Each structure stands twice: as structure tokens, then as C-alpha cells.
Amino acid sequence: MFNNAIRKTSICVALTLAFSANAMAVTEIPFWHSMEGELGVEVNSLADRFNQSHSDYKIVPVYKGNYEQSLAAGIAAFRSGKAPAILQVYEVGTATMMASKAIKPVFQVFKDANINFDESVFVPTVAGYYTDAKTGHLLSQPFNSSTPVLYYNKDAFKKAGLNPDQPPKTWQELAEDTAKLRAAGSSCGYASGWQGWIQIENFSAWHGQPIASRNNGFDGTDAVLEFNKPLQVKHIQLLSDMNKKGDFTYFGRKDESTAKFYNGDCAITTASSGSLADIRHYAKFNYGVGMMPYDADAKDAPQNAIIGGASLWVMDGKDKDTYKGVAEFLQFLTQPEIAAEWHQKTGYLPITTAAYELTKQQGFYDKNPGADVATRQMLNKPPLPYTKGLRLGNMPQIRTVVDEELEGVWTGKKTPQQALDTAVSRGDVLLHRFEQTNK
């Protein structure tokens, strides 16, 4: 009896130790991100699905605030030796991350983990944004890439006597439509989120205009800003005139206008294609998705949109097991079924060609008109050297400068020319500072 008791106890102890060993063997991989609302739900779902199929690793997603806050937190954490394994960084933080000495290039992560990594699976115009010009390899992995699109309230269009299946194609048409929408009872005709990205950066690319010299900084850090030219000034003047009439309303520097749209306050907004998840969830009216408007007088417009959103950077200083798990997770995200579902649920671009083709085969675009607008904008025409994106140092700070100067226009303190001239001169100081720091 006594021996049996000892034997049973020994078995229990052995099992306990075995389970404990298995638990200890799980490598936790912190993943800091900026996805909130419905997007945050989808990020958690991706992590759960990976964790269920990979018993050796556990992705731990942590929301760290908006893009600016998350980038600052990630860099600060690296300096204190407490960085996450994966950090989501928005597209204009690319130059900052490249110069930070805080990252391990994603192609190197796969190589060291002995996991095959075919970089050609990514949509070229997306991958090009995050590729090292010297090596031709990806520094970070595209994740939630987007372009700005136009969302409009079809019910409000009907009420105003406008065609609900015909969103404005030009900025001139948008100005006319918003006046009619306001006259028909809309308290807000048009609003826009992310004004620097949409009204300056993408407006410039959409019209084939450079944002900065040196091919928007891709060819060197000695670039200077060039978005204070006649076409950009004309565009800001149009918005200023609309603002004075009450047809354009400014709600803030981020995506505040998206909530104003899906709450029914604003009849038209321009926002990230990634806003579709929240709009689909919250809007209680019929809505449509259209391409970004272009200036009717601009030659050869529209050209192609440049991407926004973010990519996933792998932080330096982690152990071998962590990097192996990171590589497994990043590979998981590129699986056609996973990447296609992420695209379909969120409104972000399909980051791989296979995800795009699978989405078409499934008939998703036929069932969801407008869901392919962001992709069509990106592929509208072959990109020019200065419409493939931008790679400018201190770009987050430059966007803040642009916000400040445009706010001077909306409050009537500055003319569009004065605001853009000042934004360029202030921004050039930041570019020069970045160049000197990273020589």
C-alpha cells in the first residue's frame, strides 16, 4: 500500500513537472500595436489563431496608443532594454526606424531562423516602401497598408437630390455637392482625417507632384520639401473657401472625422481605407466608397495613391527562440487565407498578391462594391519616382508642423500660401537636423 502511494505520488509529481516544463517552454512574444476599436479586435483574433496552432509560442498583443505614441514608447523601451519583440510603426516612421539602430531587419530574422521567406509574395508597390535600397531586402514586414478613400452617405445624397451611386470625382464637384448637402439639412458637408497625409502627401502624389526633392527622400537624406507649389496652394485655398462657407469642417489632426461620418453628422469624409471596419460596424445608413477626388484642371491626374498604415518591425536584442517565434508569426500573417481575411475585414490593402487574387476568386469585391477602391487607387498608374511613397527623416514631426500651419488657415490667421511656405521652411529645418544626426 505504502509503495503504491509513493508510486502514485511520484507519477503525480512527474506529470506536474512535465506540465510545468511545457508551460515554461512557451516563448512569449510581446507585440505592441496601435489598432483600436474593431481593428484591435481583429489583431487579437490573429494572435489567438496563431497561438492555438503554435504551442511553443504565445503572441501577446498590447495596444500602446496611436502611431506617434507607440513609436515613442517603442524607442524609449529599447533604450531601457525593455522593448517588445514586434513593434507596429506607421509608414512615416520608416526613416526613423532605419536610423534607430534598434531593429533587426526582417529578412535577417527569417534567415537566422532558417525559415524560407519569399519577399516576392508582397505587392511590389507596398513592399517597395519598406525595402532597403542598398540590399533590396525588406527591413520590416507590411501589415496594415492603406490609401485614403472617400466615404459618402448615400441616404444624404438622395435627400439632397444627388445620385447616390455617383460620388464626386473632382474636388470641384465635391465643393458643389457639399453645398447641396448642407442646404438639404446635413450639419457637416465634408470633413477629413489625417490632413497632412491626405490633403498634402496624397494630394501631391495623386496629381503627380513631388512632396520633396530626391524622389521624396528615397535617393538621400539631403532632400528638401516641395509641397508649396501652385497646385497644392490652389487645393488648400479651395478647402479654405469651403471652410468659410461652413461646407468643410475641421475636427482634428487624427481620424476624428470618421466618427463624425458614421454617426451621421458629416455626409462626406476622406479617411483611411482601414476606417472601413469601424464604418461598417457603426454606420446605420447606406454608405458608399469612392476614389479620392482630383483637381479637374490638373494635367494627367489622377496618378496613383501612396500608402499609409504601418508595418511590423522586429526589435534588436532578443534571444534565438524569440526570433524563431517572430518569424513563424510573420510567415503566418502572409498565408493567403489569413492575409485575405485581414484585408476583407479591415479595409486595409491586400499585402500579398495571393491575398488579392483569393479575394477576387471568392467574389468579395462583387458582393462588397467599393472594397477594392484602395487597391485600384494604388495601382491606378505605374508609380513615378516621386509617387511611390516618401522616406523623410523626422516625418512625424513634419506632419505636426503641417497640422499647425493648416490650422492657421482654417482659423483665418494665414493664407494657404503663407501656411505652406512656412510649413516647408520649418520642415526643412527638421530634415536638415535628421541628415546631420545620421551622417
Swiss-Prot record:
Subcellular location per the Swiss-Prot or TrEMBL entry: Periplasm
PROSITE patterns xrefs: SBP_BACTERIAL_1 (PS01037)
GO CC annotations, alphabetized: cell envelope; periplasmic space
Complex formation: The complex is composed of two ATP-binding proteins (UgpC), two transmembrane proteins (UgpA and UgpE) and a solute-binding protein (UgpB).
Coiled-coil region(s): none
PANTHER family in the record: ARABINOSE-BINDING PROTEIN-RELATED (PTHR43649), SN-GLYCEROL-3-PHOSPHATE-BINDING PERIPLASMIC PROTEIN UGPB (PTHR43649:SF31)
GO BP of this protein: transmembrane transport
Native source organism of the sequence: Yersinia enterocolitica serotype O:8 / biotype 1B (strain NCTC 13174 / 8081)
Residues that, per the record, bind sn-glycerol 3-phosphate: Y67, E91, S146, S272, G309, Y348, R399
UniProt record similarity statement: Belongs to the bacterial solute-binding protein 1 family.
Annotated InterPro entries: Bact_solute-bd_prot1, SBP, SBP_1_CS
The protein's name: sn-glycerol-3-phosphate-binding periplasmic protein UgpB
Signal peptide from the UniProt entry: 1-25
Pfam families the UniProt entry points to: SBP_bac_8 (PF13416)
Keywords, sorted A to Z: Periplasm, Signal, Transport
General function of this protein: Part of the ABC transporter complex UgpBAEC involved in sn-glycerol-3-phosphate (G3P) import. Binds G3P.
NCBIfam families assigned: PRK10974.1 (NF008211)
